Regions:
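An N-terminal assembly and electron-transfer interface module characteristic of large anaerobic redox
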Residues: 1-413
C-alpha cells in the first residue's frame, strides 16, 4: 500500500520557499535565479557543519550511499536550525531515473520527514516522468533557460580554476566570479539571459582581465560520482585544497553529464536494435545540446590565454576504446572516458572521488583505473574514499602524498 504524501500545489508557489541542496555553487546560483524568474521562491542551502552528517546518520540507513546521507542531512539540519517555517517550505531533490540509488533519494527524504515534518512537500526534479508536482512544471522555456545556466556555470567554473592558482593579486579571481555571477543572475531574474555570445564574452573578458603569473602548475583532474565530484560539502573543498597545494584543478563540466544522459537513450536503440519516440527525441536533443556546447568551446578558443573543454564526441571515442557505451549505471562510461580524456590531453594526475555505497562508481571509476593506466602509462590516478567515518585528515594525507609524487617528477622540480 502506497503512503500518501503532501504535494507541492499551485497555491504553494506564492507561499512556500523551495530549499535546494548545494551541489554546484556556481551553477545553482544561476539555476535559482532562473527559477525565480518563473515564479518560484527558492533558496540555496549553505549549511555545511558536522551537524549535516550527523542528521544524515540519524535519519538515513547507514548502508545508504554517502551522497544521500549528505543531501538529506543538509535538509534536516536546515529545518532544525529555526531559520525556516516548516509550514512555508518545500524541498527539491533530483531523480535521475536510472538504476542508481539516487532515484530513491526522494523516498528516503520523505521517510526522514515523516516524524517531525509530515506537512513539508518534496518536489522531484526529473526529466523522465518519474513523478510530477501540480505546482512545479518544467516548461520548454524554463528548460531552455536551465540549459543556459548549465553552460554559463561550466564556463565560469572552468575559467575560475584556470585563473585562481595563478592570480597575481589575491582575490581578483573571486571578484571576477562574483561580478559575472551577479550580472547573469540579474539577467536571469529579469527578461532572461539574452544573447549567449554576449554573455560568453562578458564572462571571458572578466576572467581574462585577471593578472596571472607566467608559470605552469601541475594539473589535477577531478572525476567520480557526480555529487561528490562537485560538492564542496561532500569532497571537503577538494578544489580549494588542490589550489592551496600548488595545483590547477581540472573539473569536467556538468553539460558532459547532461549529454551523457541524452545519448544513452540513443545508444540503447543502437545496441539493442530498436527505434521509438524516445530514441528519436533523444537523438535530436543530443545533437542540439552538443551544438550548444561546441559553440561555447569556440567562444573559449578565441582567447589564447584559456584552454577549452574537451569535445563530447572525443569522450565517446575514449569510452569506445576503454569500456563500452552500454555501461550506463550511475555515471557509467562517462567517468572512465573522462579519465581517459584527461590523461590524453596532458592532465595525467587524476583524483577519483569515491563515495561510500556508490557501487557503480567503484566499478566504472576505481575498477577501470587499471585499464586507463594500461592505455596511458604515465597517468597517476588516486581514489579517495568519502564516507561519514572518513576524516578529512586521512583524505588530505592521501592527496598530499599524491602532490609529493607530482613534485618528484623532473618536469615539476
Amino acid at each position: 500500500m502506497e503512503t500518501k504524501h503532501v504535494q507541492f500545489t499551485e497555491e504553494m508557489r506564492k507561499t512556500h520557499t523551495i530549499l535546494i541542496p548545494d551541489m554546484l555553487p556556481i551553477h545553482f546560483k544561476l539555476i535559482t535565479a532562473v527559477l525565480g524568474r518563473y515564479g518560484y521562491k527558492t533558496e540555496l542551502l549553505q549549511n555545511s557543519a558536522r551537524a549535516v552528517v550527523d542528521e544524515g546518520l540519524k535519519n538515513v540507513h547507514n548502508d545508504t550511499c554517502y551522497p544521500a546521507l549528505l543531501v538529506i542531512g543538509q535538509f534536516l539540519d536546515a529545518l532544525k536550525s529555526g531559520k525556516y517555517d516548516p509550514d512555508k517550505v518545500a524541498l527539491m531533490i533530483s531523480q535521475t531515473g536510472g538504476g542508481c540509488r539516487a532515484s530513491n533519494y526522494l523516498h528516503l527524504l520523505r521517510k526522514a520527514l515523516e516524524a517531525e515534518y509530515p506537512q513539508i512537500p518534496v518536489i522531484s526534479l526529473n526529466f523522465s516522468g518519474l513523478e510530477k508536482s501540480p505546482g512545479f512544471k518544467l516548461t520548454l522555456p524554463l528548460l531552455l533557460k536551465l540549459v543556459d545556466a548549465v553552460l554559463y556555470g561550466d564556463l565560469m567554473m572552468m575559467l575560475y580554476n584556470q585563473c585562481k592558482p595563478y592570480e597575481v593579486n589575491e582575490g581578483d579571481t573571486d571578484a571576477a566570479l562574483a561580478a559575472t555571477e551577479l550580472a547573469l543572475a540579474k539577467k536571469a531574474a529579469g527578461r532572461g539571459f539574452g544573447s549567449k555570445r554576449k554573455n560568453y564574452k562578458l564572462i571571458l573578458d572578466a576572467f581574462a582581465a585577471v593578472r596571472r603569473k607566467n608559470q605552469e602548475k601541475p594539473r589535477v583532474g577531478i572525476v567520480g560520482e557526480i555529487y561528490v565530484k562537485y560538492s564542496p560539502l561532500a569532497n571537503n573543498h577538494l578544489e580549494e585544497f588542490l589550489i592551496r597545494g600548488g595545483c590547477e584543478p581540472v573539473v569536467p563540466g556538468l553539460m558532459d553529464f547532461v549529454l551523457y544522459c541524452a545519448v544513452n537513450n540513443v545508444n540503447d536503440g543502437r545496441i539493442y536494435g530498436f527505434k521509438n519516440t524516445m530514441t528519436r527525441v533523444s537523438s535530436l536533443l543530443y545533437k542540439y545540446l552538443l551544438s550548444l556546447n561546441r559553440k561555447l568551446g569556440k567562444a573559449v578558443d578565441k582567447y589564447v590565454c584559456f584552454r577549452s573543454m574537451d569535445d563530447f564526441e572525443e569522450l565517446r571515442k575514449e569510452a569506445d576504446k576503454l569500456i563500452n557505451q552500454g555501461v550506463k549505471m550511475g555515471e557509467g562510461w562517462l567517468i572512465t572516458a573522462e579519465m581517459g580524456c584527461l590523461a590524453k590531453t596532458g592532465t595525467l594526475n587524476i583524483v577519483c572521488t569515491q563515495p561510500f555505497g556508490c557501487l557503480p562508481n567503484h566499478i566504472v571509476a576505481k575498477g577501470m583505473s587499471r585499464r586507463v593506466k594500461d592505455e596511458y602509462p604515465d597517468a597517476n590516478i588516486v581514489a579517495i574514499d568519502y564516507d561519514p567515518s572518513a576524516t578529512s585528515v586521512n583524505q588530505e594525507n592521501r592527496l598530499k602524498l599524491m602532490l609529493a609524487n607530482i613534485r618528484e617528477k623532473p618536469e615539476h622540480k
